């Protein structure tokens, strides 16, 4: 696959700062992590990647509460926030951030 300048820049910046990244994805199906992993040198910055499409995976791997999934849905800002926090705890991350799909109507 063709490497994109933005992905290269991200990997370079993370490498220079000695940062690693862990992702937790759902509706993107691993596209974010795959895009980063496609860059040469990504093994220095990728810690792990969770693809938690099923609700059970969200609960078991990244600690999303069953209640949140039942009341807010799998594709909601609340679920995305819990995925972010759970992923960070599982990976023992120093910093967290998130990007999510638009909430479905």
Each predicted region: which residue ranges?
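Short alpha-helical segments enriched in small residues
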Residues: 1-104
């Amino acid at each position: 696959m063709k490497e994109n300048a933005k992905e290269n820049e991200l990997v370079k910046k993370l490498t220079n700062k000695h940062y690693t990244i862990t992702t937790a994805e759902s509706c993107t199906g691993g596209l974010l992590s795959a895009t980063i992993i496609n860059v040469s040198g990504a093994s220095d910055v990728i810690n792990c990647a969770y693809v938690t499409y099923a609700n059970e995976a969200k609960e078991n791997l990244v600690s999303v509460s069953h209640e949140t999934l039942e009341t807010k849905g799998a594709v909601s800002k609340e679920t995305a926030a819990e995925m972010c926090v759970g992923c960070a705890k599982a990976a023992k991350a120093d910093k967290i951030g998130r990007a999510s799909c638009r909430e479905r109507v």
